[in-house]
Curated annotation (Swiss-Prot):
FMN binds at residues 12-16, 73, 165-166, 206-208. It holds the Pfam family Nitroreductase. The keyword Oxidoreductase applies. Its EC number is 1.6.99.-. It comes from the Bacteria. One of its GO terms (molecular function) is oxidoreductase activity. This is Major NAD(P)H-flavin oxidoreductase. PANTHER family: NAD(P)H NITROREDUCTASE YDGI-RELATED (PTHR43673), NADH DEHYDROGENASE_NAD(P)H NITROREDUCTASE XCC3605-RELATED (PTHR43673:SF10). SUPFAM superfamilies: FMN-dependent nitroreductase-like. Homodimer. Keywords: FAD, Flavoprotein, FMN, Luminescence, NAD, NADP, Oxidoreductase.
Length: 218
């Protein structure tokens, strides 16, 4: 299949080693961040925050978060261009949704008169409340929707990436306490350009299950 979307997805892969001399341009970074902002979410809740690790000081903090576990991902932090933390809200309140609906009014998606009726969608949030009054089991998957959007955007931009679930959420919440207040982070994304001779994964063929093994058409 020659469609450009398929070309993007056939060529993207998980980078295993980065070239520290190459940085993502501010123009391309702006495209990625706007794509993240435009990502889909349940009831348009947008229960997330995307924290961009760019400076050397921020990278050192991120590097230090691997002190206790998942050290195999630690080398990416200083070698890649940027790291993005995909953070999801622990609790999602009516006030949070009011911000979303007020923006929808400002954007002329709904009228002020329709706003209260639109709050009916918040019932879905209440159905996903745990015994501690938190909604993280529901907000966490929303962050992964944004992650998928980011991966395809990066493929289109010819920027390499490494999805990292091998992080330490507890230590991250301590090191980035101010930035993650009210949020948790279970996945991060390293972005940049792979090392031309030391990224073994760059030259390996793509391997996915056969179409008929994963697609059922009724």
């Amino acid at each position: 299949m020659t469609h450009p979307i398929i070309h993007d997805l056939e060529n993207r892969y998980t980078s295993k080693k980065y070239d520290p001399s190459k940085k993502v341009s501010q123009e391309d970074l702006a495209v990625l961040l706007e794509a993240l902002r435009l990502s889909a979410s349940s009831i348009n809740s947008q229960p997330w925050k995307f924290i961009v690790i760019e400076s050397d000081a921020a990278k050192q903090r991120m590097h230090d978060s691997f002190a206790n576990m998942h050290q195999f991902n630690q080398p990416h932090i200083k070698a890649c261009s940027h790291v993005i933390l995909f953070a999801n809200k622990l609790s999602y309140t009516r006030d949070d949704y009011d911000v979303v609906l007020s923006k929808a009014v400002a954007d002329k998606r709904i009228t002020e008169e329709q706003k209260e009726a639109a709050f009916a969608s918040f019932k879905f949030v209440e159905l996903n409340c745990d015994e501690n009054g938190e909604h993280k089991a529901w907000t966490k998957p929303q962050a992964y929707l944004a992650l998928g959007n980011a991966l395809h955007t990066l493929a289109r931009l010819n920027i390499d990436s490494t999805t990292m679930e091998g992080i330490d959420p507890e230590l991250l919440s301590e090191i980035f306490a101010d930035e993650l207040k009210g949020y948790e982070c279970h996945v991060a994304l390293a972005i940049g350009y792979h090392h031309p001779s030391e990224d073994y994964n760059a030259s390996l063929p793509k391997s996915r299950k056969a179409f008929e093994d994963v697609i059922t058409i009724l």
